[in-house]
Regions:
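Short hydrophobic/aromatic beta-strand micro-patches
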Residues: 2-4, 69-71
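N-terminal first-folded block
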Residues: 4, 9-29
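Conserved active-site tyrosine of GNAT-family acetyltransferases
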Residues: 11-16, 82, 107-110
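Vicinal oxygen chelate
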Residues: 22-69, 77-106, 117-123
Length: 123
């Protein structure tokens, strides 16, 4: 997955600092982050516009087309840390009927980020 971002340094600070992802590679306006199971790439809006030979609009905050989700050990702690680091909160930690505790924040470019923790239920 490639996320289009306005400011690569700001996005890297969020994803490496606040979410703890490891920088795998950076070259100019492009970077890859190691999520553990896969890679998340970041590419600046201006560079992607040049690649596609078109102007790209920023995503609308009230109409997300997708979310980026990460599993964490403790949603409450991760949510508190993300908000303390400046991530705008969207939904506070909530137990979901599908067996997870989830919370949502926005990254510096307005992308919806979900953090999820599996709940252990007795059978």
């Amino acid at each position: 997955m490639i996320l289009i971002v306005e400011d690569l340094d700001r996005a890297l600070h969020f994803y490496t600092g606040a979410l703890g992802l490891r920088l795998g590679h950076r070259s100019g306006d492009y970077a890859q982050l190691d999520t553990g199971a896969t890679r998340l790439a970041l590419y600046t809006r201006s560079a992607m516009g040049k690649t596609l030979d078109m102007s790209l609009d920023a995503p609308a905050a009230n109409a997300p087309g997708f979310e980026v989700g990460f599993k964490v050990a403790d949603v409450d702690a991760a949510f508190s840390e993300l908000v303390a680091r400046g991530a705008p909160p969207v939904v506070s930690p909530t137990d979901r009927f599908w067996g997870q505790r989830t919370a949502y924040v926005r990254d510096p470019d307005g992308h919806l980020v979900e953090i999820a923790q599996d709940l252990h239920r007795s059978r």
